[in-house]
Regions:
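A short helix-coil junction within the Rossmann-fold of NAD(P)-dependent oxidoreductases
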Residues: 6-15
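Active-site helix of classical SDR
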Residues: 4, 39
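Hydrophobic structural elements of the Rossmann-like NAD(P)H-binding subdomain
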Residues: 19, 59-62, 72
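Residue(s) in the substrate-gating loop at a strand-loop-helix junction
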Residues: 23
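C-terminal helical subdomain
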Residues: 61-64, 69, 80-127
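Active-site-adjacent segment of SDR/Rossmann-fold oxidoreductases
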Residues: 28, 49-58
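Active-site loop immediately N-terminal to the catalytic Tyr-X3-Lys motif
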Residues: 28-34
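Catalytic tyrosine of NAD(P)H-dependent dehydrogenase/reductases that use a Tyr as the general acid/base
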Residues: 1, 36
């Protein structure tokens, strides 16, 4: 929030863009993920609110999908015993089947949005 607030004057004058990294956990329930999911839902709401309050700034929240990150590794190797069994199996299966995206894939999409996102996408939660 502080970063957004600090950047707003420059973003207004440049008609800049804010791209938030959200998650499927913002709209789906996972046992033991309450705080994480709530924080991502807040980002989605903030993007929507900023689209109204800051019309010169394009603000988007994006769900990049299942990405092969340190968080995914920790879900499989560290937290699998505290997660719901079905959820733990789901995330392990994504890795085993090659179903995780490389970080560069959503990274390129998000970089492109940061440079060229159309104003019509402001306030949207992209999946």
């Amino acid at each position: 929030m502080r970063q957004v607030k600090a950047a707003l004057p420059a973003l207004r004058s440049s008609q800049g863009r804010i791209i938030f990294t959200s998650s499927g956990a913002a709209v789906n329930t996972y046992s033991t993920w309450g705080a994480y999911g709530a924080s991502k839902a807040v980002l989605n709401r903030l993007a929507l609110t900023l689209s109204v309050e800051e019309p010169d700034v394009t603000t988007i929240s994006i769900r990049p999908g299942a990405v092969d990150t340190e968080m995914q590794r920790e879900l499989r190797e560290v937290h699998h015993n505290t997660m719901d069994t079905r959820d733990a199996e789901k995330f392990a299966g994504l890795k085993a089947s090659g179903g995780l995206l490389k970080p560069e894939q959503p990274g390129h999409v998000m970089a492109r949005l940061a440079l060229d996102a159309p104003k019509e996408l402001s306030g949207r939660f992209l999946r």
